[in-house]
Each structure stands twice: as C-alpha cells, then as structure tokens.
A protein has these predicted regions:
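Domain-wide signal for the mature, well-folded portions of proteins, strongly enriched
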Residues: 1-4, 27, 49, 151
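Active-site acidic catalytic loop and adjacent metal/ATP-binding pocket
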Residues: 1-24
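Short amphipathic alpha-helical segments, especially helix-boundary/capping motifs
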Residues: 3-5, 38-42, 93-98
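Glycine- and acidic
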Residues: 9-13, 41-48, 103
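Active-site activation/catalytic loop segments of kinase-like enzymes and analogous catalytic loops
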Residues: 21-91, 113-129
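Regulatory N- and C-terminal appendages and interdomain linkers associated
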Residues: 84-179
C-alpha cells in the first residue's frame, strides 16, 4: 500500500523474486486443488462435467500464456539476454530460443505447482476447497490424491511436456481406484 508519504508492506512473506513460471504455476495449482476437492462438494451427476471443465481451463490458461508470451517475445523483446541483434537482425529466427524459454518456464511452473499443492495441504495456509469438506475420511482421501499429484509434479517436472500431459496425470491420480 502506497501513499505520497508512506509505503506499507502487507504480508511480506509473499514478496518474492523467483522463476518466471512461479505465477502461472501458482494459478494452475489452485485449479488442480479445486479439481481434486470436487468429489467433496458435488454429486456424481455434475462432478465429471465440472472437473473436466477445470482441466480444460488449465489447458486453455497455459496456451493463452504461451501465445501472449510469444506475441510479446516477437514485439517487445529488449535487454541483453535474447536481443534481436543476435537473431532477427542476422536473418535468423529466434524460435529455438523462444521455445527453450517456454519449456523452461513450463518446467518451473510444474514444479511450483506441485510445491504449492503440498504447502496448501500441509502448512498453516490451508485450502478452503479441502477444508470445507466435512467428511474427514473423504477429505483425507482427496488431500492424499492432491499430495501424490503434487509429488509427481515436483519430482518429474522436466518429463511433463505440456498442459495436456499434466491434465492426463490429474485424471490418473483422481481415479476411484487410486488410493
């Protein structure tokens, strides 16, 4: 909060400098926690439709991010890391560098997503999607699925190549036979 005379920091623990994939990873983690918690909030008739919608939102969100990043890369890229003078000004494409950067951002996002899925279940900053499930047996099962998915994302962030693979993995961990 800033005024002409003073600046106050609220929740300074959230002041952070980190990987480019941090914000998109945090967003996806919240989508996934909503996805995994839904059996505690909906009847089976509407459950599948809603969960599939959440997974579609994840895929569309990252694709929108990718397209916007690509647009900005091509129109507003400045600085010393990937200057146009090294690529376009030499008659070369910067697509390889762009794709490498997007892959790196995705890998960071996947790992951050998994970490946040753990933090929101295991720390003091609980997730309302799970906390509001009154049936503790059901809640613990859904939280366990969430934690197992988060573990997979942390340990295998480099092998999950895109949002479609991530949502397929979510379906695997969400199956009735899992746990």
């Amino acid at each position: 909060m800033c005024t002409d005379n003073e600046t106050k920091v609220i929740d300074p623990e959230f002041g952070f400098y980190g990987p480019m994939g941090f914000d998109i990873g945090m967003l996806i983690s919240n989508y996934l926690m909503a996805y995994f918690s839904q059996p505690g909030h909906r009847d089976s008739e509407k459950l599948s439709e809603y969960q599939n919608w959440i997974l579609k939102v994840i895929e569309e969100t990252f694709e929108t991010f990718r397209q916007e990043f690509k647009k900005l890369w091509n129109s507003e890229r400045t600085g010393i890391l990937f200057p146009s003078s090294m690529f376009e000004d030499q008659g070369d494409s910067s697509d390889f560098a762009l794709n490498a950067m997007l892959e790196h951002i995705w890998q960071d996002a996947v790992a951050v997503c998994g970490i946040e899925m753990h933090r929101r279940v295991l720390s003091l900053a609980h997730n309302a999607d799970f906390e509001e499930i009154n049936d503790t047996k059901k809640r613990s099962k859904l939280e366990a699925r969430n934690l197992m998915m988060g573990r997979e994302l942390i340990l295998n962030n480099k092998s999950i190549k895109n949002a479609s693979e991530l949502t397929s993995l979510a379906k695997k961990f969400n199956s009735e036979n899992y746990l």
